[in-house]
């Protein structure tokens, strides 16, 4: 008797973005920029912003998970584990995943957050898959969500044009039909940590009048260095996963890259030899939602996917962190 290895398959996806749309034209009123400048350099036309008092990332995550449970006809009490990838948790502790778990009534699940910046969703997806493949968990929810507006300085024209709020969630279940996550590669390099970071607010540099006056609770990044590193690492790791699995570009249905900057995405796809028709983009609508970009692509483009399609996910983020996942889509939408 042949025993097939259990794989971890995505059985449903759902996304959420706030109602408020912040356009490039509105940003022209806040900083010295233009719609043309933003679109040319980033590909972004608008982004969503979560408004209202006491509205944190858990609000986005809860919307995603409630929609996912309804869509997949799943009872919250069936969920074994919830992992939330985010760099904008509601608070240092408890975890945002813990707060979401309570909101949705997942009384039988345990939960935790993963912090790997823009690579967070891939880190969380790879982590969750191990519990499924080990046979110890049947239903795991992975969330990628961020309220980036909470750490963006809207007087900094280089950064404020890039980021938006939003996220998505996926349900992982066991599969024995060879669909699901086939392989993943995750990497990190702490030597680049200071190039893309939040300088204050942690135990090393707690909040103070000085850190607030110095605006150290907002995103800091060295743009040109990040651009070069991101293109190199995203392309290298995607090529590595293709080589490891004997995949050529003609066998790839779609590349789903982290939506940081259209120029980074174009350069990465070009390095991989993948044509623009196979590269999924929604950055023009949402900007960079950090851990939310790839699950939002799942949500936006789900109807394109057919069972057995080869998908390559690729991301790069602060840390530095980067990674790639190769999966076979598990259902026809």
What does each model-found stretch correspond to?
Residues 1-54, 156-228, 232, 236, ...:
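Condensing-enzyme catalytic core mediating Claisen C-C bond formation in acyl metabolism
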Residues 77-85, 249-258:
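Short glycine-rich phosphate-binding loop at a beta-alpha junction
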Residues 22, 93-95, 152-156, 323-326:
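Short acidic, glycine/serine/threonine-rich loops at helix termini
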Residues 54, 58, 62-65, 69, ...:
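Claisen-condensing/thiolase-fold acyl-transfer catalytic domains that form or cleave C-C bonds
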Residues 31-40, 91-105, 141-148, 203-211, ...:
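Acidic-glycine-rich active-site phosphate/pyrophosphate-binding loop
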Residues 133-167:
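Flexible, glycine-rich active-site loops centered on histidine and acidic residues
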Residues 73-107:
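Anion-binding (especially nucleotide phosphate/pyrophosphate-binding) glycine-rich loop
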Residues 11-14, 85, 115, 139-146, ...:
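Short beta-strand segments
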